[in-house]
């Protein structure tokens, strides 16, 4: 069979005219038609073969692509690949990469911490041992069905890395989690202090109360010399906070301050007559209760310090000399002696003691008469016997009068004056006496006294 060159109709080889269109078919044309038909048949056969080969080729290409993808994923996502990324970062001091790898949802590690970690690992573990221990641990966990975490440790047994299984990646590879254990640096300042420093890539402020343990946050293993500003009521200091995981205790590590600061130790001279409870020191613009064993500060070594003191003797306040310590003379522990005018203090104390002895004698006479009058008044139930000893309408006057009305007996036997303190027309005294059942009783009273000490009256019982 061949095709008509005019209409394409199939005609027999021995036909001289196309039955469809009437086209005359010569031998030459029939040969051409035959050749064309043969060519068409060959093309059809080729197309059939191509249609069979193309799907196979595509399948082979996809298979090769899958194999390549698998190896790529394995190179970057298998447990061994994950371990290799970490150890290479540590080995090459790539603090930025280490910070990224060790950061977690709850703890962001910054470049500074990461570099401290790298230095610590290389010094306390050794990079070769660190790499070997990680690879051995990963292989062991990879072959095990256990989900129990393993730890990489220093030579002294401190944990520096936790390795644990954390599900799978792409449903094929075990996912390993690499985290650095954290501890809390603890600081205990002598005074309330505010610390400002950077951690986890941002500024942090911690306020620590005096003599109380205060955590600075969470840090990964390292030996830290952390730049930090320290602010107290005495001034602002620039320095460092130092803490070393080699000296840690369980979950905490102690912090040592490293600041250019001075503590002041103050001693008094010529102050033996002053009342201990009244003694105070003034440092710059702040006043403190004084104790000979107390250490004052810290103060910055960059500024002069002005120091003075006060104390009371027999109710009068005396001041010491004022000293200014220049910044150049400030040491870590600076000793200062403040001198009082002992002659002036002693003279005043001697004068007041004479007055007090005179007043004490008068009070002894007053309370002896008061005790006798009170006992007689209660025996006779007559308040008028003792009313002159009280200031009229004072609290003790009203109270004692009520005792008579209620027939409540009050007894005072053998009164003795233990102490006296006078302030103008007001006298406060402590009296010891025996009550009605023989017990010694101490009572404090306040009295009013006139200018020439000739008359005094009870105002209240303290």
Curated annotation (Swiss-Prot):
**Keywords (A to Z) from UniProt:** Antibiotic resistance, Cell membrane, Membrane, Metal-binding, Transmembrane, Transmembrane helix, Zinc, Zinc-finger
Give the location in the cell: Cell membrane
Q: An example of a Gene Ontology BP annotation on this entry? A: response to antibiotic
The residue spans the entry assigns to the Extracellular side of the membrane are as follows 74-462
Q: Which residues cross the membrane?
A: 53-73
Regarding the membrane, this protein is recorded as: Single-pass membrane protein
InterPro entries assigned to the protein according to its UniProt record, in alphabetical order: Mem_prot_TcaA, TcaA_2nd, TcaA_4th, Zinc_ribbon_dom
List residue spans of C4-type Zn fingers: 4-21
Q: What is its main location?
A: membrane
Q: Which Pfam families match?
A: TcaA_2nd, TcaA_3rd_4th, TcaA_5th, Zn_Ribbon_1
- Name of protein: Membrane-associated protein TcaA
The GO cellular component terms are: plasma membrane
Q: Does the keyword Disulfide bond apply?
A: no
Name which cysteines form disulfide bonds: none
Describe the family membership recorded for this protein in Swiss-Prot or TrEMBL: Belongs to the TcaA family.
Cytoplasmic side: which ranges?
A: 1-52
Quote the function comment for this protein: Plays a major role in decreasing resistance to glycopeptide antibiotics.
A molecular function (GO) held by this record is: zinc ion binding
């Amino acid at each position: 069979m061949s095709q008509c060159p005019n209409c394409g109709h199939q005609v027999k080889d021995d036909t001289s005219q196309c039955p469809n269109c009437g086209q005359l078919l010569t031998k030459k044309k029939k040969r051409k038609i035959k050749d064309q038909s043969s060519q068409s048949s060959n093309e059809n056969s080729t197309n059939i073969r191509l249609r069979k080969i193309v799907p196979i080729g595509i399948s082979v290409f996809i298979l090769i692509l899958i194999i390549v993808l698998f190896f790529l994923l394995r190179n970057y996502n298998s447990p061994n690949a994950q371990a290799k990324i970490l150890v290479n970062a540590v080995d090459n001091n790539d603090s930025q990469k280490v910070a990224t790898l060790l950061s977690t949802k709850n703890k962001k590690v910054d470049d500074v911490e990461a570099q401290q970690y790298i230095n610590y690992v290389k010094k306390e573990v050794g990079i070769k041992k660190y790499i070997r221990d990680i690879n051995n641990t990963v292989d062991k966990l990879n072959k095990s069905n256990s989900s129990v975490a393993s730890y990489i440790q220093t030579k002294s047994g401190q944990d520096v890395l936790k390795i644990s299984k954390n599900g799978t990646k792409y449903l094929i590879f075990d996912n390993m989690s690499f985290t650095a254990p954290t501890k809390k640096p603890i600081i205990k300042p002598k005074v309330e202090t505010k610390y400002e420093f950077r951690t986890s890539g941002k500024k942090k402020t911690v306020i620590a109360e005096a003599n109380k343990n205060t955590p600075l946050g969470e840090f990964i293993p390292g030996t830290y010399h952390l730049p930090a500003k320290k602010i107290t009521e005495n001034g602002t200091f620039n320095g460092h906070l130092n803490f070393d995981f080699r000296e840690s205790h369980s979950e905490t590590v102690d912090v040592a301050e490293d600041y250019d600061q001075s503590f002041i130790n103050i001693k008094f001279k010529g102050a033996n007559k002053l009342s201990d409870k009244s003694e105070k020191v003034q440092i710059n613009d702040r006043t403190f209760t004084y104790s000979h064993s107390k250490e004052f500060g810290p103060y910055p070594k960059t500024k002069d310090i002005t120091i003075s003191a006060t104390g009371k003797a027999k109710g009068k306040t005396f001041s010491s000399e004022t000293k200014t310590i220049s910044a150049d003379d400030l040491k870590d522990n600076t000793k200062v002696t403040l001198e009082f005018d002992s002659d002036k203090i002693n003279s005043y104390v001697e004068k007041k003691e004479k007055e007090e002895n005179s007043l004490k004698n008068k009070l002894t006479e007053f309370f002896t008469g008061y005790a006798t009058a009170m006992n007689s008044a209660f025996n006779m139930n007559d308040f008028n016997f003792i009313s002159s000893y009280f200031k009229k309408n004072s609290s003790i006057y009203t109270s004692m009068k009520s005792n008579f009305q209620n027939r409540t007996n009050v007894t005072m036997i053998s009164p003795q004056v233990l102490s006296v303190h006078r302030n103008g027309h007001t006298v406060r005294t402590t009296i010891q006496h025996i009550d009605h059942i023989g017990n010694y009783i101490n009572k404090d009273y306040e009295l009013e006294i006139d200018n020439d000490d000739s008359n005094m009256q009870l105002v209240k019982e303290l």
